[in-house]
């Protein structure tokens, strides 16, 4: 079964090789270098594989390699843990690839109760494609008050975090550093594509974003990967102004992801978040 999400091992190796400076590896920059980064023979030597074999991998004459070889190449290219995991995924054949099992895009009743009970935390349930399957009032108020609260429950118009980031000006203007936010969106999408190379809906999402956003297309081509599970973001919110929030992600039993945003206790940011909740309550009572 063919892979429909393009996760090209050869071009990924080439981009990672071009990123490494010879000096980082203790290599003399001997002679004039026509191209950035390490030469193929240098990577092969550092990884302990033949230059011919490494070249075949990079030129896609060999589609896969053993995990041991891939780990050696990852060390030679100084890949991060997330980049190494991605390399192992795209460089190893999928065992007995099946049509992807239909993913359950429903939020369980207990998870829905949990969402509702997280009062001072903005929380949402996402699938791996970053479609929003459910959110609590605060998440809705923080990110998408211009959409109906029931939008996640309607599959045909379900909001997608990455599409909103690139294609919805209301959301785009929320981030104090939109460039950093969009880069982390794309590096995450690239990371999870290693696990879901046969998913037509993921391929469709990537295709749609590539056509509709030049910025997305440029970032996607860079092939950077990271599994963005926690960190902090600075918002410039139209209702409460500047807001710095920490975020974390947790895997749910059904394969979906619980994403939540919270402020540092007793900080001005917590006060701003509470103001957003008060504003919310006043809206509910009118």
Show where each model-derived region lies.
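Amphipathic, well-packed alpha-helical segments that form the structural scaffold of globular domains
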Residues: 14-21, 88, 92, 116, ...
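Short amphipathic recognition helices of helix-turn-helix/homeodomain-type DNA-binding modules
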Residues: 2-9, 13-14, 67-71, 75-106
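Recognition helix of helix-turn-helix/homeodomain-like DNA-binding domains
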Residues: 30-34, 40-41, 47-64, 74
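A short, Lys/Arg-rich alpha-helix, primarily the initiator
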Residues: 1-38
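An N-terminal domain-cap segment
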Residues: 24-38, 96-117
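Hydrophobic protein-protein interaction segments
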Residues: 109-127, 133-286
């Amino acid at each position: 079964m063919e892979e429909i999400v393009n996760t090209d091992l050869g071009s990924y190796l080439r981009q990672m090789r071009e990123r490494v400076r010879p000096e980082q590896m203790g290599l003399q920059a001997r002679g004039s270098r026509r191209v950035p980064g390490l030469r193929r023979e240098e990577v092969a030597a550092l990884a302990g594989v033949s230059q011919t074999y490494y070249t075949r991998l990079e030129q896609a004459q060999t589609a896969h390699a053993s995990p041991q070889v891939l780990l050696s190449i990852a060390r030679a290219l100084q890949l991060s843990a997330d980049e190494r995991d991605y390399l192992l995924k795209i460089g190893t054949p999928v065992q007995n690839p099946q049509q992807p099992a239909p993913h359950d895009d429903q939020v369980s009743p207990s998870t829905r109760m949990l969402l509702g009970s997280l009062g001072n935390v903005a929380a949402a349930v996402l699938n791996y494609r970053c479609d929003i399957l459910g959110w609590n009032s605060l998440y809705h108020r923080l990110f998408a008050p211009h959409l109906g609260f029931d939008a996640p429950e309607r599959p045909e118009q379900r909001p997608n975090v990455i599409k909103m980031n690139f294609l919805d000006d209301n959301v785009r203007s929320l981030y104090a550093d939109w460039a950093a936010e969009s880069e982390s969106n794309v590096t995450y999408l690239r990371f999870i594509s290693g696990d879901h190379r046969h998913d037509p809906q993921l391929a469709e999402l990537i295709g749609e974003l590539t056509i509709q956003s030049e910025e997305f297309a440029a970032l996607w081509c860079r092939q950077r990967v990271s599994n963005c599970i926690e960190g902090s973001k600075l918002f410039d919110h139209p209702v409460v102004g500047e807001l710095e929030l920490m975020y974390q992600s947790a895997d749910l039993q059904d394969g979906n992801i619980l994403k939540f945003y919270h402020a540092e206790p007793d900080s001005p940011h917590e006060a701003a978040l509470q103001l957003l909740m008060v504003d919310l309550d006043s809206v509910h009572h009118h």
